Protein backbone atom coordinates (compact mmCIF):
# COMPACT_ATOMS: atom_id res chain seq x y z
CA UNK A 1 0.00 0.00 0.00
CA UNK A 2 2.80 2.44 0.88
CA UNK A 3 4.59 1.74 -2.41
CA UNK A 4 1.40 2.35 -4.38
CA UNK A 5 0.54 5.54 -2.54
CA UNK A 6 3.99 7.00 -1.95
CA UNK A 7 6.28 5.10 -4.34
CA UNK A 8 7.96 8.16 -5.85
CA UNK A 9 8.61 9.62 -2.40
CA UNK A 10 10.00 6.29 -1.15
CA UNK A 11 12.24 5.95 -4.22
CA UNK A 12 13.62 9.46 -3.71
CA UNK A 13 14.21 8.78 -0.01
CA UNK A 14 16.09 5.54 -0.81
CA UNK A 15 18.11 7.25 -3.54
CA UNK A 16 19.23 10.02 -1.15
CA UNK A 17 20.03 7.55 1.67
CA UNK A 18 22.09 5.24 -0.53
CA UNK A 19 23.93 8.06 -2.28
CA UNK A 20 24.66 9.64 1.11
CA UNK A 21 26.31 6.38 2.20
CA UNK A 22 28.84 6.03 -0.63
CA UNK A 23 26.36 4.87 -3.28
CA UNK A 24 25.08 1.49 -4.48
CA UNK A 25 28.63 0.16 -5.02
CA UNK A 26 29.13 0.37 -1.24
CA UNK A 27 26.25 -2.00 -0.42
CA UNK A 28 27.01 -5.72 -0.59
CA UNK A 29 24.13 -8.14 -0.12
CA UNK A 30 24.88 -10.73 2.56
CA UNK A 31 21.80 -12.90 2.24
CA UNK A 32 18.95 -13.65 -0.11
CA UNK A 33 19.05 -14.18 -3.84
CA UNK A 34 21.67 -11.45 -4.39
CA UNK A 35 24.12 -12.60 -1.71
CA UNK A 36 27.69 -11.65 -2.60
CA UNK A 37 26.70 -8.97 -5.13
CA UNK A 38 26.56 -5.20 -4.76
CA UNK A 39 23.38 -3.22 -5.17
CA UNK A 40 24.98 -1.50 -8.17
CA UNK A 41 25.67 -4.88 -9.84
CA UNK A 42 22.12 -6.10 -9.30
CA UNK A 43 20.58 -2.85 -10.58
CA UNK A 44 22.82 -2.88 -13.67
CA UNK A 45 21.99 -6.53 -14.41
CA UNK A 46 18.29 -5.71 -14.17
CA UNK A 47 18.74 -2.46 -16.13
CA UNK A 48 16.80 -0.40 -13.62
CA UNK A 49 17.45 2.14 -10.86
CA UNK A 50 18.86 0.73 -7.63
CA UNK A 51 16.02 2.22 -5.61
CA UNK A 52 13.54 0.10 -7.59
CA UNK A 53 15.55 -3.02 -6.68
CA UNK A 54 15.35 -2.05 -3.00
CA UNK A 55 11.62 -1.35 -3.17
CA UNK A 56 10.97 -4.73 -4.75
CA UNK A 57 13.09 -6.49 -2.09
CA UNK A 58 11.14 -4.78 0.67
CA UNK A 59 12.25 -4.22 4.27
CA UNK A 60 12.90 -7.92 4.98
CA UNK A 61 14.48 -8.81 1.63
CA UNK A 62 18.15 -9.24 2.58
CA UNK A 63 20.92 -8.32 4.95
CA UNK A 64 23.81 -6.28 3.63
CA UNK A 65 27.23 -4.90 4.45
CA UNK A 66 27.52 -1.13 4.11
CA UNK A 67 30.99 0.21 3.34
CA UNK A 68 30.65 3.56 5.08
CA UNK A 69 33.36 3.56 7.76
CA UNK A 70 35.45 6.70 7.96
CA UNK A 71 39.03 5.80 8.93
CA UNK A 72 39.48 9.14 10.71
CA UNK A 73 36.63 8.22 13.04
CA UNK A 74 38.08 4.74 13.61
CA UNK A 75 41.46 6.23 14.57
CA UNK A 76 39.83 8.74 16.93
CA UNK A 77 37.85 5.97 18.60
CA UNK A 78 40.91 3.75 18.96
CA UNK A 79 42.76 6.61 20.66
CA UNK A 80 39.99 7.06 23.24
CA UNK A 81 40.83 5.00 26.35
CA UNK A 82 37.13 4.40 27.04
CA UNK A 83 36.36 2.83 23.66
CA UNK A 84 36.10 -0.94 23.44
CA UNK A 85 36.52 -3.08 20.35
CA UNK A 86 33.59 -5.40 19.75
CA UNK A 87 31.66 -7.05 16.95
CA UNK A 88 28.04 -7.68 16.13
CA UNK A 89 28.99 -10.52 13.80
CA UNK A 90 27.53 -13.99 14.14
CA UNK A 91 27.98 -17.37 12.43
CA UNK A 92 24.67 -16.95 10.60
CA UNK A 93 25.76 -13.62 9.13
CA UNK A 94 27.58 -13.65 5.79
CA UNK A 95 30.08 -11.02 6.90
CA UNK A 96 33.78 -11.50 7.68
CA UNK A 97 33.51 -9.66 10.98
CA UNK A 98 31.91 -12.76 12.49
CA UNK A 99 35.26 -14.55 12.28
CA UNK A 100 37.87 -11.86 11.72
CA UNK A 101 37.19 -8.70 13.72
CA UNK A 102 39.66 -9.20 16.53
CA UNK A 103 42.38 -10.67 14.34
CA UNK A 104 41.96 -7.69 12.01
CA UNK A 105 42.36 -5.21 14.87
CA UNK A 106 45.47 -7.05 16.02
CA UNK A 107 46.97 -7.26 12.53
CA UNK A 108 46.10 -3.82 11.24
CA UNK A 109 46.05 -1.49 14.22
CA UNK A 110 48.68 -3.19 16.41
CA UNK A 111 51.17 -4.77 14.00
CA UNK A 112 50.87 -2.74 10.79
CA UNK A 113 49.80 0.73 11.95
CA UNK A 114 51.07 0.82 15.53
CA UNK A 115 47.92 2.65 16.64
CA UNK A 116 47.60 0.41 19.71
CA UNK A 117 50.01 -1.60 21.81
CA UNK A 118 49.09 -5.27 22.09
CA UNK A 119 48.30 -4.70 25.76
CA UNK A 120 45.90 -1.85 24.96
CA UNK A 121 44.27 -3.85 22.17
CA UNK A 122 43.66 -6.83 24.48
CA UNK A 123 42.31 -4.49 27.16
CA UNK A 124 39.89 -2.93 24.65
CA UNK A 125 38.82 -6.33 23.28
CA UNK A 126 38.54 -8.23 26.57
CA UNK A 127 39.22 -6.57 29.93
CA UNK A 128 37.34 -3.31 29.38
CA UNK A 129 34.42 -5.16 27.84
CA UNK A 130 34.23 -7.39 30.93
CA UNK A 131 34.22 -4.27 33.12
CA UNK A 132 31.52 -2.62 31.04
CA UNK A 133 29.30 -5.66 31.55
CA UNK A 134 30.24 -5.84 35.25
CA UNK A 135 31.77 -9.27 34.79
CA UNK A 136 34.53 -8.11 37.15
CA UNK A 137 32.07 -7.31 39.95
CA UNK A 138 31.93 -10.04 42.61
CA UNK A 139 28.52 -8.73 43.69
CA UNK A 140 27.16 -9.49 40.21
CA UNK A 141 28.94 -12.67 39.07
CA UNK A 142 30.08 -15.77 40.94
CA UNK A 143 33.48 -15.91 39.25
CA UNK A 144 34.78 -12.58 37.98
CA UNK A 145 36.67 -12.20 34.72
CA UNK A 146 38.39 -9.47 32.77
CA UNK A 147 41.83 -9.62 34.38
CA UNK A 148 44.43 -12.31 34.92
CA UNK A 149 44.13 -12.68 38.69
CA UNK A 150 44.08 -15.54 41.15
CA UNK A 151 40.55 -16.88 41.59
CA UNK A 152 39.24 -15.21 38.43
CA UNK A 153 38.11 -17.05 35.30
CA UNK A 154 40.34 -16.52 32.29
CA UNK A 155 40.52 -17.92 28.77
CA UNK A 156 44.14 -17.35 27.82
CA UNK A 157 45.80 -17.79 24.44
CA UNK A 158 49.51 -17.28 23.86
CA UNK A 159 50.16 -15.83 20.41
CA UNK A 160 52.60 -13.79 18.38
CA UNK A 161 50.77 -10.66 17.16
CA UNK A 162 52.90 -10.60 14.00
CA UNK A 163 51.50 -14.01 13.02
CA UNK A 164 47.81 -13.14 13.49
CA UNK A 165 45.80 -12.83 10.27
CA UNK A 166 42.13 -12.28 9.56
CA UNK A 167 41.35 -14.77 6.80
CA UNK A 168 37.61 -14.20 6.36
CA UNK A 169 36.41 -12.09 3.46
CA UNK A 170 33.07 -11.51 1.76
CA UNK A 171 33.53 -14.54 -0.50
CA UNK A 172 34.50 -16.78 2.45
CA UNK A 173 33.02 -15.09 5.53
CA UNK A 174 33.29 -18.20 7.74
CA UNK A 175 37.03 -18.70 7.27
CA UNK A 176 38.72 -18.80 10.67
CA UNK A 177 41.44 -16.33 11.56
CA UNK A 178 44.99 -17.64 11.62
Segments predicted by a language model, with ranges:
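Short alpha-helix capping/helix-loop boundary micro-motifs
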Residues: 135-146
Amino acid sequence: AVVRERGAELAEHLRRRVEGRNGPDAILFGSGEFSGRTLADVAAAQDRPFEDVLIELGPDGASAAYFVMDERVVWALLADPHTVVSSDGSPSMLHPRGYGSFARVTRRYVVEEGALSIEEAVRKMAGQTARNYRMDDVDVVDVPRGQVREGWAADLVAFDPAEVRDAADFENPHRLAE
